[in-house]
Amino acid sequence: MGIWKWLVMASLVWPVLTLRNVYDMKIECPHTVSFGENSVIGYVELPPMPLADTAQLVPESSCSMDNHQSLNTITKYTQVSWRGKADQSQSSQNSFETVSTEVDLKGTCVLKHKMVEESYRSRKSITCYDLSCNSTYCKPTLYMIVPIHACNMMKSCLIALGPYRVQVVYERTYCMTGVLIEGKCFVPDQSVVSIIKHGIFDIASVHIVCFFVAVKGNTYKIFEQVKKSFESTCNDTENKVQGYYICIVGGNSAPIYVPTLDDFRSMEAFTGIFRSPHGEDHDLAGEETATYSIVGPANAKVPHSASSDTLSLIAFSGIPSYSSLSILTSSTEAKHVFSPGLFPKLNHTNCDKGAIPLMWTGMIDVPRYYDGIHPFTVFCVLSGPGASCEAFSEGGIFNITSPMCLVSKQNRFRLTEQQVNFVCQRVDVDIVVYCNGQRKVILTKTLVIGQCIYTITSLFSLLPGVAHSIAVELCVPGFHGWATAALLVTFCFGWVLIPAVTFIILAILKFIANIFHTSNQENRLKSVLRKIKEEFEKTKGSMVCDVCKYECETYKELKAHGVSCPQSQCPYCFTHCEPTEAAFQAHYKVCQVTHRFRDDLKKTVTPQNFTPGCYRTLNLFRYKSRCYIFTMWIFLLVLESILWAASASETPLTPVWNDNAHGVGSIPMHTDLELDFSLTSSSKYTYRRKLTNPLEAQSIDLHIEIEEQTIGVDVHALGHWFDGRLNLKTSFHCYGACTKYEYPWHTAKCHYERDYQYETSWGCNPSDCPGCGTGCTACGLYLDRLKPVGSAYKIITIRYSRRVCVQFGEENLCKIIDMNDCFVSRHVKVCIIGTVSKFSQGDTLLFFGPLEGGGLIFKHWRTSTCQFGDPGDIMSPRDKGFLCPEFPGSFRKKCNFATTPICEYDGNMVSGYKKVMATIDSFQSFNTSTMHFTDERIEWKDPDGMLRDHINILVTKDIDFDNLGENPCKIGLQTSSIEGAWGSGVGFTLTCLVSLTECPTFLTSIKACDKAICYGAESVTLTRGQNTVKVSGKGGHSGSTFKCCHGEDCSPNGLHAAAPHLDKVNGISEIENSKEYDDGAPQCGIKCWFVKSGEWISGIFSGNWIVLIVLCVFLLFSLVLLSILCPVRKHKKS
């Protein structure tokens, strides 16, 4: 066994040398301090250290909160250890012995009666440690319990334990008072009545930490309850220990006292402590696969001075996984046991010589109710090249993501609100934020407008009022802003710029004319090309006669040479010549008619009448004329005003509002009216028309409203999905059957064991084993560190529905229709023909947090014969017990001569949750909004518009106009208030007071308009009396007076909206903003443009006449500058 011990020692020492000695302990805090004596707890597993150094371990804290003094007292432990006998060469039950000694340990988790309660009242912390040891080394586990007030007092502090430094980090969750489980906030409660009152009842698996508190008294005889609960036959002689366990649930709770009969949380913990007494293991990362060597059963004396053995143990060697601190049960006085390298007997089916754990960690199932999910608010301000944003939520933010922002991990809490700051690097696109199940959009266009206004106002800071008034007009994005700038520049500096620009244009035209035309109107470029061609022809010799070598001037002359010279004749006078070059050249010198061809060419040329050219005309243009400048100035002002009015409101992308003029479109009913279109699931649709009789002057109002899609699924709740760590442990002993010993993993919820018993090969036994055919190698697989990660629901049926309302004259009808269903009235038929969806019957919906946050769609979720690593492998259904996965792999025992056998497993070791998270992008996801759910049904609306409905609307032409034409409903309008800004940025919200008389209900639409254009509408069902309607719109200008309108009628008074500025921009909910509105109103025409221009001009100067004065000053300055640069030409008197 000596060589094996040295190998284990090396494997334990090496990680200590390589790891850093500073470790993090995270304590999760809710962001409000609730009533009651709540405490929070955190713990951290530390690397192994030599057993001899544990006697000097004392926790030392630098935290501002004092540590409870009673933990500084020394606790006497009976240390039980084992050693091999010198006279035994082979392993057997008698080859080793136990030794009991008394040791003093300081700072272990020996809690006194009322210590936790006193620490809460005195605002002190409890810092202690547990030990998991073998015969050589110990792994400390440091615990810290603090009152919940510490969450408000501290952010971090440092604790020293031996050679290690632990950084305590207080991390606030988004939960108000509850515990964060599966990404949800829940409140464990012992009262089922209060659970039903507060919300949805559910069962959750929660982590719990328990400490034994020794106290004498008849009410603290813990084994009396053990006998009642587990039908034990133990008597008080064998089990005299008195005390109770004090537990903290979920890392944040009031103390729970175990056992307490009327608290089922307490009884759940009590059951876990005595059925699975070892609790969760203390394995570090990388210790999932380990080996034990069982030495054998042993007895020890506790205390060391006892006359007989009082405690049964099992000696082992290998990696320590479970606590080595326990309490002897056979004494009324608390006898503390420290057993490095030995498992104390914690199973109480046999009553004698047992112990109970000093500390216990595990999972219990408790009922709960959910904390509500609150809506959030987000706004952004311009910061450098990007934007700085803040999100708030009253009840906390459980998730916040943005595809174009860097979401900060630093959270701040203000009273009951949680604040999250994040930075967006780009503002050229709108910022989309997903938070608390909502999708909101920050329109960054307004941020850019604000930056523009700020810059222009800063440049002209001498007149800030004037600069701001002009800046808010210039900074409107798109063509409208450029048109505004052109209009102002033309008005102020047109008298200088018009002649200057004209001069530049004339210079360019004259340059072009000079290039392409001569004074005789001949194309100069063509002339140059012709001369180049002639010179090229001369260069290559084509104008030279082949016989006489004379260079001709015209092609006709060359042709005459080609006829006469071969016949020995002069081509000019036809005289006979010798057929040689010299004779011809001598004759040409004396010939009198060599100019014959040149004279013929001159006769064919006729004189042309020359007219003044383009260049001369451009030179004579009088661009300095005051008449020309005034005419162009007036023309440009009118043209730019029209262009400005036409561009005064941008047309946003569908499916949102399109600006139009006042009124409602009309349709003559010659034939049936049919509409066929597709509609995204997040969009509303409003269709409004005035149907007219083509034969007579009769009409009737039609108003159709289709609300956004509601997705409803009937589900079967599959339960909670867990993540866990799979451990592979080898337990070897040289003698005895495999069933002789109880291994610690037997009490794990999910475990599987394969035994190799009584091996007959020498190669599978170490050298100190007694021989062939003895001993056992037990290969154990078990799951620990179980953590609930999500809730799964299987879709049984799915339904897509929309609410349809129709106002036909005075007839008002509504109905909720499904896919392949229709709304049918006497004149109108609205049908959903089909739906394009990514959901189907049999799919499984998995939520990793609150249902409001959306989830994943699984097409192949395993509900039966689940193997470890499948989706749904570790489940806890509500109507069944804990479901463990199958482990389909096979074991193999690896043997080497004279060494301990090692188990190998060829199956999957990665949990299904970890596999899903590694490939999460391959799964379809969905977002939810307006969530309603029960155990059997879930309903939500899709904020992303990922689904589509095929809608068909049919209105028959057979309408009884005589009986339906008159609508008795009377509507009165009044504008109450306005919020927001004009322009195409964030927009404005107009509050309208609408009164309805003469009929009980009326479905119609209220618009937000100025004198020329309407910028938004809201479809609303009015009831008799006074109604408050809020209408949102985008657009308008500084002169717009926004009014509430119904058809052609508007409220008598209007209100001005604020100018877009550098203020914060709030996010807009996509569900509220996604709507398609079609009322057939005409587009803005020329008359509308002039009305809009007049309203703007009157508005820009209304209340700020200094702007007009400043503009006129600039105009006068330009006139003076014109007179200096372009003086009037003086004409001489005749």
UniProtKB/Swiss-Prot annotation:
Residues on Lumenal side? 19-487, 649-1104
Q: Where is the signal peptide?
A: 1-18
Q: What residues bear carbohydrate chains?
A: 134, 235, 347, 399, 927
Q: Which UniProt keywords apply?
A: Disulfide bond, Fusion of virus membrane with host endosomal membrane, Fusion of virus membrane with host membrane, Glycoprotein, Host endoplasmic reticulum, Host Golgi apparatus, Host membrane, Host mitochondrion, Host-virus interaction, Inhibition of host innate immune response by virus, Inhibition of host RLR pathway by virus, Inhibition of host TRAFs by virus, Membrane, Metal-binding, Phosphoprotein, Repeat, Signal, Transmembrane, Transmembrane helix, Viral attachment to host cell, Viral envelope protein, Viral immunoevasion, Viral penetration into host cytoplasm, Virion, Virus endocytosis by host, Virus entry into host cell, Zinc, Zinc-finger
Q: Which InterPro entries match?
A: Envelope_glycoprot_Hantavirus, Gc_C_bunya, Gn-B_hanta, Hanta_Gc_N, Hanta_Gn-H, ITAM_motif_hantavir-typ
Stretches that traverse the bilayer: 488-508, 628-648, 1105-1125
**Where in this protein does the record put region Fusion loop?**
756-776
Q: Which PROSITE patterns match?
A: ITAM_2 (PS51056)
Q: Which chain segments does UniProt annotate as zinc-finger regions (CCHC-type)?
A: 545-565, 570-591
The record's similarity note reads: Belongs to the hantavirus envelope glycoprotein family.
Protein name in the entry: Envelopment polyprotein
Its ancestry begins with: Viruses, Riboviria, Orthornavirae, Negarnaviricota, Polyploviricotina
